[in-house]
């Protein structure tokens, strides 16, 4: 190194268990034994400690699990480790996910960056802050542009992900100008190579080709991207670290462009597959920019150059994935043509460590994505469910379903309102997902809750929120079985209109204390991005002897109110809840079969299939109110969101016939 070269002493690398940053960290550890490297990573779904295996034995390496959004932790690390250089890679990066969870991108990419910058300002010891951004902040490049975006080009982001990265850049620039922080920004194009989580196209296509599955291309495949091999990118950051000028921006890219269709064809050729039969064109994404193109001259003037050609880089990448097929565990959710929010990798434990598996080097993982009808999806051995509600109806059925599907599960021993016991469960069981099927509905019915309000609050509100928060702290998805009995027909959703209540609608039924608590906790759970809320209504199963079964209930009543309602056939929808967990789906879902069925229609089916001599009589809602303590919810739920995700789901009447009445037919 010459006299003008910057030489750091103690480097903090954020997000270093992720793809690009792990290659950078491993390279610096390998090439500079006199540098102390501290890496900080919260270990989310696309990062893994195994990515840093080459560095763990080095005396100048230290790993810290934590979130850049924790200002206390960041300040503590800067001071105690005497950090003089930060290489900030940590970010949410998958564009598709940013459309369904943009607030999480804002939290990670903007707020997290702000925390780091403020810590740098307060400690006053940072000599270099290298902020890693993306070429997507420039926006879409004109198709006929002969010159790529240079570092002074206007920022015109087109999606939530790139908008958060551009926002973070503005903060970096402001802290550089306002407080004199020694900042450098990089903007990179697409990177590929070993260790990359298969939400990105190249590893996704390789894994699909390995398992003989079609390669899904959005639109016509004419979109153009530039690709750099990961080791070339790691070298670029090595150059920027030592030779980059404070206050400058550097594009990390290549002028060699490739159409998506050509990338898919090249991967097919590597596997000896016919591209025409192996490539499947699927519906395009509405936010799929046509082209990103960078000018790469500024970085080259520092002495960097691309070393790995496309053919060699792709071959190295393919070889790595075929030799490490289980690196990421169950990635079936990521391999879907249109994945929603991606799952936690199967090998991830709640404490951030990874399960070690003995996999021979020539093993090829077969990845399967099966619809809920088959009740089988992905690598079941990598899943482990923690279920609360062992003694309840839904909890018991979930356990039986896991046994049937070969999924490892355990019931939680802790009580929902006891935080310490929940933490102990997660530490000992180390689940990949948590299912909450616990709750107080009242025995024999919701009238019980009217005289047991403290107990109902303790479990339905305080307990559920406690479990959600413990899961959040451990980066776990919580599948929460809730209720749709928080709505009632009204002027905008009249009975018989076919207009159902949607997921975003706010509760309008508070006739029972049970419903009040469920409405309250649902509203609060909206603030937890790790929760999937399933609104169950009047649950039904093929077990007609179970007193919790809605059909069993009304068949034992002397009189029933004949009114149409949305309902949940558990035999069909409980397997869907497991599939939703595998797909890492979040937010609120109306968990009912499409359509409505009246109580008289159900009892007519019961008479035709089960008990020919069965008789019943009706009474009005007003007459019913005289013999019950709390009012009952009647409504229609809009099932379009769930139906779009699972188009094979049957309507309520079809599902009743297939799963309940046909199997129990006695006449």
Swiss-Prot record:
* Record-linked InterPro entries: dTDP_Gluc_deHydtase, NAD(P)-bd_dom, NAD(P)-bd_dom_sf, RmlD-like-bd
Record has Isomerase as a keyword: yes
Task: Report the outcome of residue 36 to A.
Answer: Reduces dehydratase activity
Tissue specificity here reads: Expressed in roots, stems, leaves, seedlings, inflorescence tips, and siliques.
Name any cofactors this protein relies on.
Answer: NAD(+); NADP(+)
Instruction: Tell me the keywords, alphabetical order.
Output: Isomerase, Lyase, Multifunctional enzyme, NAD, NADP, Oxidoreductase
Which residues are the active-site ones? 135-136, 161
Into which family does the record put it? In the N-terminal section; belongs to the NAD(P)-dependent epimerase/dehydratase family. dTDP-glucose dehydratase subfamily.
Q: What is this protein called?
A: Trifunctional UDP-glucose 4,6-dehydratase/UDP-4-keto-6-deoxy-D-glucose 3,5-epimerase/UDP-4-keto-L-rhamnose-reductase RHM2
Organism, per UniProt?
Arabidopsis thaliana (Mouse-ear cress)
The organism's lineage is:
Eukaryota, Viridiplantae, Streptophyta, Embryophyta, Tracheophyta
């Amino acid at each position: 190194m010459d006299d003008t070269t910057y030489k750091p002493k103690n480097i903090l690398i954020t997000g270093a268990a992720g793809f690009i940053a792990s290659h950078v960290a491993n390279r610096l550890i390998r090439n500079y034994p006199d540098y102390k490297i501290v890496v900080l990573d919260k270990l989310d779904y696309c990062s893994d400690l195994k990515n840093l295996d080459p560095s763990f034995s080095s005396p100048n390496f230290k790993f810290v699990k934590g979130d850049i959004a924790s200002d206390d932790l960041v300040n503590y690390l800067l001071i105690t480790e005497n950090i003089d250089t930060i290489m900030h890679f940590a970010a949410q990066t998958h564009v598709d996910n940013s459309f369904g969870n943009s607030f999480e991108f804002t939290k990670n990419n903007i707020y997290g960056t702000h925390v780091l910058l403020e810590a740098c300002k307060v400690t006053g010891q940072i000599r270099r802050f290298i902020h890693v951004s993306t070429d997507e902040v420039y926006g879409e490049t004109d198709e006929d542009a002969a010159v790529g975006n240079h570092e002074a080009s206007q920022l015109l982001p087109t999606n939530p992900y790139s908008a958060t990265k551009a926002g973070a850049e503005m903060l970096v620039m402001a802290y550089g100008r306002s407080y004199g922080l020694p900042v450098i920004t990089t903007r990179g194009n697409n990177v590929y190579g070993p260790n990359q989580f298969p939400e990105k196209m190249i590893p996704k296509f390789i894994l699909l080709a390995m398992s003989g599955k079609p390669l899904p291309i959005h639109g016509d495949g004419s979109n153009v991207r530039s690709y750099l091999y990961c080791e070339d990118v790691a070298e670029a950051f090595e150059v920027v670290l030592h030779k980059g000028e404070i206050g400058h921006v550097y594009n990390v890219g290549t002028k060699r462009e490739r159409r998506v269709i050509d990338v898919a064809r090249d991967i097919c050729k590597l596997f000896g597959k016919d591209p025409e039969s192996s490539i499947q064109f699927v519906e395009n994404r509405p936010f799929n920019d046509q082209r990103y193109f960078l000018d790469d001259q500024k970085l080259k003037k520092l002495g960097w150059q691309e070393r790995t050609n496309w053919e060699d880089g792709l071959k190295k990448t393919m070889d790595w994935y075929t030799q490490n097929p289980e690196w990421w565990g169950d990635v079936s959710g990521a391999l879907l043509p249109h994945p929603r929010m991606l799952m936690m990798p199967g090998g991830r434990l709640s404490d951030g460590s990874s399960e070690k598996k003995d996999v021979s080097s020539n093993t090829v993982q077969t990845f399967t994505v099966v619809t809920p009808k088959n009740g089988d999806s992905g690598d079941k051995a990598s899943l482990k469910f923690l279920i609360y509600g062992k003694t309840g109806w839904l909890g018991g059925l979930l356990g039986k379903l896991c046994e049937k599907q070969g999924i490892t599960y355990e019931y939680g021993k802790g009580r929902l309102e006891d935080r310490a016991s929940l933490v102990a469960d997660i530490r000992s069981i180390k689940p990949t997902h948590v299912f909450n099927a616990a709750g107080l509905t009242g025995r024999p019915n919701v009238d019980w809750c009217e005289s047991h309000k403290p107990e109902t609050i303790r479990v339905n509100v305080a307990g559920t929120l406690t479990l959600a928060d413990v899961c959040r702290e451990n980066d776990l998805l919580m599948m929460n079985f809730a209720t749709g009995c928080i709505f009632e027909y009204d002027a905008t959703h009249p009975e018989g209109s076919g207009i159902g209540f949607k997921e975003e609608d706010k509760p309008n039924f508070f006739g029972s204390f049970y419903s009040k608590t469920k409405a309250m906790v649902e509203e609060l759970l909206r603030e937890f991005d790790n929760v999937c809320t399933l609104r169950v209504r009047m649950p039904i199963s093929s077990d007609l002897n179970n007193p919790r079964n809605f059909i069993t209930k009304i068949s034992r009543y002397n009189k029933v109110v004949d009114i149409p309602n949305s309902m949940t056939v558990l035999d069909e929808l409980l397997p869907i809840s497991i599939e939703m967990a595998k797909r890492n789906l979040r937010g609120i879902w109306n968990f009912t079969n499409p359509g409505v069925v009246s109580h008289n229609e159900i009892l007519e089916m019961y008479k035709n299939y089960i008990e020919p001599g069965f008789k019943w009589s009706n009474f009005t809602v007003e007459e019913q109110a005289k013999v019950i303590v709390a009012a009952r919810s009647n409504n229609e739920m809009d099932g379009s969101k769930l139906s779009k995700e699972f188009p094979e789901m049957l309507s309520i009447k079809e599902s009743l016939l297939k799963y309940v009445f046909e199997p129990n037919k006695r006449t």
